[in-house]
């Protein structure tokens, strides 16, 4: 017994010495230990974010979420609540345009210009059964093709299978009404779930050049590989892009990029059937006759004030008449472009839809001269000047993700936040930003983060140069039957709502290209010149 006690005490002494040594070692190397923990958790976070920025099972983190991450989380949670899961066992249980019923409330033989026309929509499935929930992606439009007139309608979802569709009768004549079921609520739910599951619908290929050697390598926002990666990071804004590092090639040798769609889908076979051409954009009001709208001897409409920077927008924001855009809340004057732009420095930042503006300016102002910036490719930065009038207009693309089958240079690419940061700004400086189309194939957190970072950069710009005019151009609607999982207008509509929400607290103006292109009925990511010209006319009224 005595020997056992001695052995027990000896064991305790040894354990105490061992514990003391471990504590001493950790204390001496605490910085290294915590750095290692931080690094592993950071890599774990980035490498496991392919399903969602904020997974169902939260990761254990030693660092609290940043303000940006908290805001992203908040926005995604709100969207998740608005787009609940809608599983279905058969297509017959999804919304049917044919079986749904639309009824004009308080119908009349003739309506008066300026009246509100309301339609009650009750949606049913393909078996004719009344649906008990909403969430369908609908598009309402009124038009008079002979008058080259059009406007969007407002859709109110009561979340019980009924909707109120409201039209403002802006003009006289015979008016056609349209209500399209773009996607049933089950399709909306499937698109939302699929979007946030993967970053690999688009494959990026980077070209690395070192002397006479040229190598191509896989790149992307997230790469699920154990290979060594080149990391192109903006640590401040927490944005990144990655390429598999080529052998015997430095990461700085990346010069060009192109992309293509990958044969991958996160939709089930049953879900895919909802996005076949015959099931997308189906007319609900096909049997409706045109309605007649008259002046009705109403008093002359009061003159509206001229459109100016900072005005708020309504829904709908205006209408097309004789192919010309007419806002609801103000009137657009005819502006002489050359004189309006005299002494102005115009920055056009974004995708190819804002590059259309650049091309329009160059085609419309014969005194603008293009400056060779010694770049190559379709997406090269553009600069045009009129030295006599001191006009300077430039377009630059934004940083990843930038989708394009044609090879483009990345040597001059930068995040828009950095371009805004180095802009001095003053009363004759105008910045127009367009984000959206290239983000549609990726999880929504990528777009939200970019929008928040741009918001912060604009906020800083307006603090140091409050006279700078910043205009946000929203997305155009695009082709309806083109690869819904990647490019559906549903994705664009969510981004449109996010933009309006994020930028509402800043002194910026929004050009509602979404509503404008619905009114024109273009269904083209690159609308025709007359539509682009009307978008630009809003800009000219804002800045002159």
UniProtKB/Swiss-Prot annotation:
Listed InterPro entries: Ig-like_fold, Ig_E-set, NXPE4_C, NXPH/NXPE
Cell compartment(s), UniProt: Secreted
Signal peptide positions on this chain: 1-27
Keywords, ordered alphabetically: Glycoprotein, Secreted, Signal
Gene3D superfamilies (alphabetical): Immunoglobulins (2.60.40.10)
Residue positions the entry lists as glycosylated: 29, 38, 47-48, 92, 160, 210
Domain of life: Eukaryota
SS bond partners: none
A GO cellular component entry from the record: extracellular exosome
Family: Belongs to the NXPE family.
Protein name: NXPE family member 4
